[in-house]
Amino acid sequence: MARRDLRDRLFWLANESDIKSAKTTDSYFVNTKEVLDKNKIDTEATMEVFARDIPYPEIWGVLTGIYEVAKLLEGLPVDVWAMDEGLVFLADGSTAFYEPLLVIKGRYRDFVEYENPMLGLLSSSTSVSTRAARFRVAAGEKQLLSFGTRRVHPALAPLVERSCYIAGFDGLSNVLGAKLVG
């Protein structure tokens, strides 16, 4: 495999500008936007994000990542509704009695490129907070501290710590994560 030096960054990471400008999306979303723009198609759309399955016997999760999705969509001409961060949601595709975690309404071409990063922001954070909440339940009243950032990419450390904090952890080990959580 050929070695490639990065010219504009130190690490193989998307920066905030890359994410906000939709450079982290899949190419078919870019192609879709180009077709919609070229043909001046202004179709109104509603995107609903559900959790239909969780890899645990219990069908609940803890929603996180909403703050980041709100920041991603900030300034776009769309209407957004979301459950509050930290809420416990049910992920049971066998029943009609569950609601979307996130709803976006607007012209599809205004938010099509953000679908991929939105789902990534939600699923990465929510998977950590859901797992962390299960540790919180298992620990009961015992003190629970997060030391998980030594096993994730350093860029994700604040996300992991925030997700653990929202899930009920008593303390955080990562310096930057703890500082950002407050």
Residue map of PLM features:
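Ordered alpha/beta subdomains of enzyme catalytic regions
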Residues: 1-180
